[in-house]
């Protein structure tokens, strides 16, 4: 069976994106390999190795720069699941992550929306036990 292994997030700068995801969100840097022409293969992922990895791809050209921060058209485009929403919310907020709301409870679990350093929206989600998402 196939599984989603990596998604691409277009960024303005490799190092500022690494700093945000590692220092503020709490991801780990999986790989940072130099390629030709100043390009790098930069991969971050949630600590513990669960879920898909995120390839941080520096924008090349106007078309790619235009989508930075709007890769889901202003909607929540990324979903980060946790077992401890309250703890992760507090830690991330203290680290400077911008949350757009207070945590709330939905029928599928607890959720709060945050923005990455470019304005892409993410759900931090603690699925309810037994929900289709858990």
Regions found by a protein language model. Name each.
Residues 1-8, 28-81, 87-117, 125-134:
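Vicinal oxygen chelate
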Residues 11-14:
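Conserved beta-strand-loop-alpha-helix junction that forms the acyl-donor binding cleft
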Residues 16-17, 87:
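Short Gly/charged-rich anion-binding patches and loops
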Residues 17-22, 92, 119:
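Conserved active-site tyrosine of GNAT-family acetyltransferases
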